Amino acid sequence: MSDPLIKRALVSVSDKTGIVDFCRELVSLGVEIFSTGGTLKTLQDAGLKAASISTITGFPEIMDGRVKTLHPKIHGGLLAVRNNPDHSAQAIENGISFIDMVVVNLYPFEATVAKPDVSFEDAIENIDIGGPSMLRSAAKNNESVTVLTDSADYAGVLAEMRAGGGATLRSTRLRLALKVFELTSRYDRAIAGYLSKSAGTEVAAAESMTVQLDKELGMRYGENPHQSAGFYRLTDADGTRSFADYFEKLHGKELSYNNMLDIAAAGGLIEEFRGEDPSVVIIKHTNPCGVAQAPTLLEAWKRAFSTDTQAPFGGIIAFNRPLDMETAKAVNAIFTEILIAPAYEEGVLDMLMKKKDRRLLVQTGALPKGGWEFKSTPFGMLVQERDSRIATRDELKVVTKRQPTEEELGDLMFAWKICKHIKSNTILYVRNRQTYGVGAGQMSRVDSSKIARWKASEVNLDLHGSVVASDAFFPFADGLLAAAEAGVTAVIQPGGSIRDNEVIEAADANNLAMVFTGMRHFKH
């Protein structure tokens, strides 16, 4: 079957970008245009010859435009198989004319429900019914019908029509049909997600769920060079989330798979200190190797770096303040993969960009606190609520005879925010709002404690007067006793062990203040 000439087009768009120029070209190619509502008015106001859809259906738009294209003369004209004699005979018998092109984009449901003050009624009115129906009919019959949902495709289709005497290529029609089904799938997922949240349905308890993944960034390879990879924006019950919603890359090489993991880790941790004193986070292999707060960003950098003077090389640095020149010069003295800041002061970017490969990012918005987390296994997908909570001071329970001092409480809360972002088992030593020793990812909590103390000793950081945080309870008193021997004065941990009393007694015996959060922060 030869490529069919496009003689009649149905045009109905919410996003009218480029539609007048596109339709003007269609008219010049001899295409008859039919349209609806606001689109028809836009075309006619531009002086284009376009007819109302009601001239096809013989039926007016009714119910505030809810019903206008749901008609056999529309869908028959789209779905008829052109080389099927029975279809052709039935079309003639019922006064149905073929429609060769559909140009439709949908009511902006996702943009509508993203508004913080959207009403349920507004959301419902932005659920498109006729649009998806026409798109699906046209896409199903892609052998004969060209369907467009994206203004980015207008120029290419026009070029093909000019070259092909008014026809498009079969490969183009198939590609455009695929875009339709990807679009309608994502659209329905957004609607289902919104209604699920409105009804109070918990996604983790649902019998089934759907997520939409759309490629946002290509990558040379994955975690290792022999693994292929890409980064995909995610649409689920909580809406659509993409890298571009929260970060902008200003300079440097393309981002790798490992870079994205580290950016997520750095962004999540620096978010804990939004609105607080100047803070610096140094990440290596998704774990913090240095974190500090200070009166100035430069001092925070110096203190964070002093926690571990080797690991930051090739690391990711995040700041909770605009990066100033003095701090930037200090950071520039070492090799770093990525810098992330809410802004860069005048002249800083010019200086940093002299290292052509280093990635410079601006964090443009606060990362979402809630939502759902997905982790794949070879045999299925795990879904859990994101670990977005952190215990407040009011929620802390002092379980020892000695109350923590105000200074100790400040360090305990600082340590607890960081501890949550370190691979389990985690033991973290903090003093004066600076990490002193990080013990991460060990199978034994005692081993994590040993590593943390060893790391502190390597850089001559004295643990006397420090506090210690543990992401889960101490199963035995030995871990706490080791911390006491190192000079710790206060402890923060979830509690919940059957041996809590033994641990509390050990703390009291060593005059330690200890608080329970009642909340564990395992991170696998």
Curated annotation (Swiss-Prot):
| Family statement | Belongs to the PurH family.
Top-level taxon: Bacteria
UniProt keyword ATP-binding present: no
* Gene, per the UniProt record: purH
Q: Which cellular component appears as one GO term in the record? A: cytosol
Q: Which one GO biological process term can you cite for this protein?
A: 'de novo' IMP biosynthetic process
PROSITE patterns recorded: MGS
Q: Which residues form the MGS-like domain?
A: 1-149
Cross-referenced HAMAP family, in alphabetical order? PurH
Which ranges does the record mark as transmembrane? none
Gene Ontology MF, one? IMP cyclohydrolase activity
Q: PANTHER family given for it?
A: BIFUNCTIONAL PURINE BIOSYNTHESIS PROTEIN ATIC, BIFUNCTIONAL PURINE BIOSYNTHESIS PROTEIN PURH
The name this protein goes by in its record: Bifunctional purine biosynthesis protein PurH
- Organism, by scientific name, is Chlorobium phaeovibrioides (strain DSM 265 / 1930)
Which reaction(s) does the protein catalyse, per the Swiss-Prot or TrEMBL entry? Answer: (6R)-10-formyltetrahydrofolate + 5-amino-1-(5-phospho-beta-D-ribosyl)imidazole-4-carboxamide = 5-formamido-1-(5-phospho-D-ribosyl)imidazole-4-carboxamide + (6S)-5,6,7,8-tetrahydrofolate; IMP + H2O = 5-formamido-1-(5-phospho-D-ribosyl)imidazole-4-carboxamide
> For this protein, what is the EC number?
2.1.2.3, 3.5.4.10
Pathway-wise, it operates in: Purine metabolism; IMP biosynthesis via de novo pathway; 5-formamido-1-(5-phospho-D-ribosyl)imidazole-4-carboxamide from 5-amino-1-(5-phospho-D-ribosyl)imidazole-4-carboxamide (10-formyl THF route): step 1/1; Purine metabolism; IMP biosynthesis via de novo pathway; IMP from 5-formamido-1-(5-phospho-D-ribosyl)imidazole-4-carboxamide: step 1/1
Q: Which keywords does this Swiss-Prot/TrEMBL entry list? A: Hydrolase, Multifunctional enzyme, Purine biosynthesis, Transferase
**Is Transferase one of the keywords?**
yes
| Domain comment (free text) | The IMP cyclohydrolase activity resides in the N-terminal region.
Under NCBIfam families, the record lists: PRK00881.1 (NF002049), purH (TIGR00355)
